[in-house]
Regions:
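Charged C-terminal helix
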Residues: 398-422
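Glycine-rich active-site/cofactor-binding loop and its immediate structural neighborhood
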Residues: 98-137
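Short, conserved beta-strand segments within well-ordered enzyme catalytic domains
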Residues: 75, 90-92, 101-105, 131-133, ...
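C-terminal helical cap(s) of enzyme catalytic domains, especially alpha/beta-barrels
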Residues: 67, 199, 331-338, 380-400
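A gly/proline- and charged-residue-enriched helix-loop-helix capping module
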Residues: 127-167
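Short beta->alpha linker loops
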Residues: 58-59, 136-140, 162, 299, ...
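An N-cap/entry alpha-helix motif that binds or orients negatively charged groups
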Residues: 2-95, 201-210, 217-277, 412-414, ...
Length: 422
């Protein structure tokens, strides 16, 4: 079966029978279908530092728990005796038809999970006909990922640097490589308090990881100082050798010496954060790109209303997967109020989605589409491109079957009447 034929077939039974038939031959799925088992297997495939960074959250991880708890509180209410022999998962976003109502979320530093990083994800997304949002903190430059995706949908996530010239350069590159929207992440103007990473003393960017968009950018490179600033800090111990070798290796990949690479990391840390980012910057952004603009990290209806007033094209209800503020509201709980305030503006949602049933619940509460994050990274850690592809197919399959078993034939039929709240 060709890729196009596979995509047009009902993904639920197709994937289900693929697993059962190979199982009858003695082969179990290499990518666990159960979310908890998927996370556990991925954790065992990664270093302790990578697992902490990817799996962990802010503070006591109460927000992460709240995200999952919100999905548990909502229950789908199936209808019976409906003709569900044909189902339609497609949605339209900003003039483009998408195979399914989810995209792969922007997640940085994917080289921690697998050596092929973003490139493996881009190839898997393209093969499955699913959109991918390139991370600002990617391990592979956006142009390489775009080339791998050919005509498949891709967007670009922007972390607004304190250097506007660099921001403009990123936006130009995104336009030039075929990105179809800009997703401005608003909830990381400062880094959240993440105990798992703090206990390990681990921030990947200081090791030169997750900086591909920077090290490949002409504006950023032109501003790298001749040598790193003197901090007075003198690291000691055996691990410093591994750090130096890692920086040297990373610099070599971008044509930079060790000294230049250390200076590049210092320049990144000096310009990354924008705690003064405000609504006037969003107004200016309209003049900086011709692409649709989405604001990611909106949780309050008044912020959604402000986005509408400024002519923003969409918002993403997100709490960064529980990685920024500990003890805040779950995104699913605030989704309906944001949808109401957004009026006709598309609202997407992420944080806590682990299954096709979760996607159905988010759509029923008004999300036009969702972003899937950690699950595909777990697939990447276990089996690279193939692992990402399996996670995507499992998501599609469960969503398709959930839709049918709820008596629905299209994701557009999902609404509040399809849910009961415990």
């Amino acid at each position: 079966m060709s890729d196009s034929e596979r995509r047009s077939a009902a993904p639920g039974r197709l994937r289900q029978m693929e697993i059962y038939v190979t199982g009858a031959g003695g082969t179990r799925p290499r990518i666990p279908v159960q979310p908890a088992a998927l996370e556990a297997k991925a954790a065992s495939a990664m270093s302790a530092q990578a697992a902490a960074y990817i799996i962990g959250g802010a503070g006591g991880e109460a927000t992460m728990s709240a995200n999952r708890g919100a999905f548990d509180r909502y229950r789908l209410v199936p209808r019976v005796l409906q003709d569900v022999s044909k189902r339609d998962l497609t949605v339209r976003l900003f003039g483009r038809a998408h195979r399914a109502p989810f995209l792969l979320a922007p997640i940085g530093v994917l080289e921690m999970a697998h050596r092929e990083a973003d490139l493996a994800v881009a190839r898997a997304a393209a093969s499955e006909g699913i959109g991918f949002i390139f991370s600002n903190q990617a391990s592979v430059a956006m142009e390489k990922c775009a080339s791998a995706m050919e005509k498949a949908p891709r967007w670009f996530q922007l972390y607004w640097s304190s250097d506007d010239e660099f921001v403009r350069s990123l936006l130009r590159r995104a336009e030039d490589c075929g990105c179809e929207a800009i997703v401005v992440t608003l909830d990381t103007t400062l880094l959240g308090w993440r105990p798992r990473d703090l206990d390990l003393g681990y921030l990947p960017f200081l090791l030169g990881l997750g900086l591909a968009q920077y090290l490949s950018d002409p504006v950023f490179r032109a501003k790298i100082p001749a040598s790193p600033p003197e901090t007075g800090f003198r690291p000691r111990g055996a691990k410093i050798l591994a750090t130096v070798l890692g920086l040297k290796r990373k610099g070599r990949a971008f044509g930079l010496s060790l000294r230049e690479m250390r200076a590049a990391v210092a320049h990144f840390t000096a310009t990354y954060s924008r705690p003064d980012l405000n609504w006037s910057d969003i107004e200016r952004l309209r003049g900086m790109t011709k692409l649709p603009i989405l604001l990611k990290g909106v949780r309050h209806p008044e912020d959604a209303a402000k986005a509408v007033a400024l002519g923003v094209d969409g918002v993403v209800v997100s709490n960064h997967g529980g990685r920024q503020v500990d003890g805040e509201t779950a995104t699913l709980d605030v989704l309906p109020s944001v949808v109401a305030a957004a009026k006709d503006m598309p609202v997407l949602m992420d944080s806590g989605i682990r299954s096709g049933a979760d996607i159905a619940k988010a759509l029923a509460l008004g999300a036009r589409a969702v972003l899937v994050g950690r699950p595909y990274v777990y697939g990447l850690a276990i089996a690279g491109q193939a692992g990402v592809g399996e996670v995507i197919r499992n998501m599609l399959a469960e969503l398709d079957l959930t839709l049918a078993l709820c008596g629905l034939t299209s994701v557009s039929e999902l609404g509040p009447e399809c849910l009961a709240k415990n």
